[in-house]
């Protein structure tokens, strides 16, 4: 049962299927990150303060369930492997939870709304964790070849960028079409459509991928020992720091984006135009990861370079807007997305290599456990970014569906440009210190293979 040839090559269909997994993830999670906050405040009628509190509370929930799910995936035994069965079982459940999350009842009392919001969102996050952690870990289980892993992650990122582009272009028109009489009906209908896409993509990923890297049987290892091993894995710690910053910048900005176009630019339809302008640069940027990696032979340095230019181009966007300087604004948007897409490919390509380094350094291989903390780091960044945005907007007088005051508009503009721009540059500095290059990685893999043989 292997999708990996003896020379470590992975069939094209398996790479495509793996990419489809992230198509599904983005039709769920990017819909949530881009539209859930404005759905809560402007459609469901929940206060900014309650939304901000939820974003922070949910990360405590993640701190509990992410490592547990990661550990459980490592211990899973089935004829389909350790990680693939989770896609088959958890994907349809998560699709149902997505629909429940976007089931608005604005006529309920505020306390009832908040209780429903907390329960459905926390269950959705748990469901997504049960899909995304095994999905992310699966790449490392498909092959140990560093170049093949780069190709698999490029396939993942290209597919993800296409999915994000399509989602961003069609979502606002779909919400308008299905919500012409009621905004809550529009959101619910779109959630049903995207939930079906989410489940179908993961079924395809399950069917056409295989786990080829065989992990030796080992005795039960405590969480304490696994944490100690993780703390000795320097490349992994840098990747984790990068993921925290990545989550803060990506999801904080995504939560702001519809507010930005609706209130700062004054026209929510600009969001669709913006999305159309960034889809092609997204795909090209993802495809450019491999040639740049071949040049630098270091995935961390590759990610660092992409992050640096993402930050510079995002900072430049502060000086322009879609209403008065559309050509420059949309050109900079495309440039920003090009560099971001390259970074997105690189940062996820790093993670499987850190697993091999950790096994070489400590003698312990715990793919799912390590990916769980990567996922947690990303979600912590997301929590801080979205909660901070919601908290600031609420504090300075945001009123749903009304003209906003100057301070609120300023917060929305900076959250879209300068704040994430600076944080991208910080991310570039952090990942510059990633030392695990291609030559050293291949030496480590050979040592591990020889050690297992002996």
For the regions a language model picked out, list residue spans one by one.
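Membrane-embedded alpha-helical bundles of multi-pass transporters/translocases
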Residues: 2-454
């Amino acid at each position: 049962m292997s999708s990996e040839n003896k020379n470590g090559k992975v069939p094209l269909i398996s790479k495509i299927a793996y990419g489809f997994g992230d198509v599904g993830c983005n039709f769920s999670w990017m819909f949530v990150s881009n539209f859930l906050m404005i759905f809560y405040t402007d459609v469901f009628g929940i206060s900014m303060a309650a939304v901000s509190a939820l974003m922070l509370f949910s990360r405590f929930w993640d701190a509990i369930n992410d490592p547990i799910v990661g550990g459980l995936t490592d211990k899973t035994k089935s004829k389909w492997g350790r990680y693939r069965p989770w896609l088959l079982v958890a994907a349809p459940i998560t699709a149902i939870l997505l629909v429940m999350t976007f089931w608005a009842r604005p006529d309920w009392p505020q306390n009832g709304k908040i209780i429903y919001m907390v329960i459905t969102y926390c269950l959705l996050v748990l469901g997504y964790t049960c899909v995304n952690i095994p999905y992310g870990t699966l790449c490392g289980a498909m092959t140990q070849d560093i170049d093949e892993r780069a190709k698999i992650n490029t396939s993942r990122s290209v597919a993800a960028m296409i999915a994000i582009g399509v989602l961003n272009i069609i979502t606002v028109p779909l919400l308008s079409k299905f919500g012409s009489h009621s905004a809550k009906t529009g959101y619910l209908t779109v959630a049903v459509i995207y939930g079906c896409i989410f489940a179908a993509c993961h079924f395809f990923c399950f069917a056409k991928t295989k786990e080829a890297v065989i992990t030796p049987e080992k005795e039960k290892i405590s969480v304490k020992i696994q944490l100690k091993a993780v703390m000795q894995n320097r490349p992994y710690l840098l990747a984790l720091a990068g993921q925290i910053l990545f989550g803060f910048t990506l999801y904080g900005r995504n939560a702001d984006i519809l507010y930005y176009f609706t209130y700062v630019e004054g026209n929510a339809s600009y969001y669709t135009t913006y999305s159309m302008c960034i889809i092609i640069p997204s795909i090209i940027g993802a495809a450019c990861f491999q040639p740049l990696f071949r040049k630098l032979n270091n995935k961390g340095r590759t990610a660092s370079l992409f992050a640096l230019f993402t930050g510079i181009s995002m900072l430049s966007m502060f000086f322009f807007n879609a209403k008065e300087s559309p050509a420059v604004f949309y050109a900079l948007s495309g440039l920003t997305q090009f560099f971001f897409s390259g970074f997105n490919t690189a940062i996820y390509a790093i993670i499987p290599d850190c697993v091999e380094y950790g096994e070489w350094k400590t003698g312990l291989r715990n793919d799912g456990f390590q990916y769980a903390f990567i996922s947690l780091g990303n979600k912590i960044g997301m929590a801080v970014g979205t909660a901070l945005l919601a908290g600031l907007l609420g504090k300075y007088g945001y009123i749903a569906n009304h003209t906003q005051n100057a301070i609120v508009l300023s917060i929305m503009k900076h959250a879209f440009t300068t704040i994430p721009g600076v944080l991208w540059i910080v991310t570039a500095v952090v990942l510059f210190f990633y030392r695990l290059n291609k030559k050293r990685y291949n030496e480590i893999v050979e040592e591990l293979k020889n050690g297992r043989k002996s």
